[in-house]
């Protein structure tokens, strides 16, 4: 079962189940980490993309959230959208502006392995 989330993010999906919202990072999750943050060189992480696509197909809401460009001011939006299209990633929203950090601490964290097990 998908872990419980706050009621303001849980809705019914078209399959009759609860639609949950997954907010998913980009680099290191669906895109490979690359030297010097040259994101145009990133490769797809196909196992995670397949898991996300299964969640999307099951009616869950997928929001991609990235720190691409947050530290440098470079606009990576076209590169990122083109990559997602080329890689076949299914999502509902893409958000930039995640603060660049060394670590993120979150009370709703699930690992990539747990995400893949859910899908």
Task: Mark where each language-model region is.
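HAD-like aspartate-dependent phosphatase fold
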Residues: 1-119
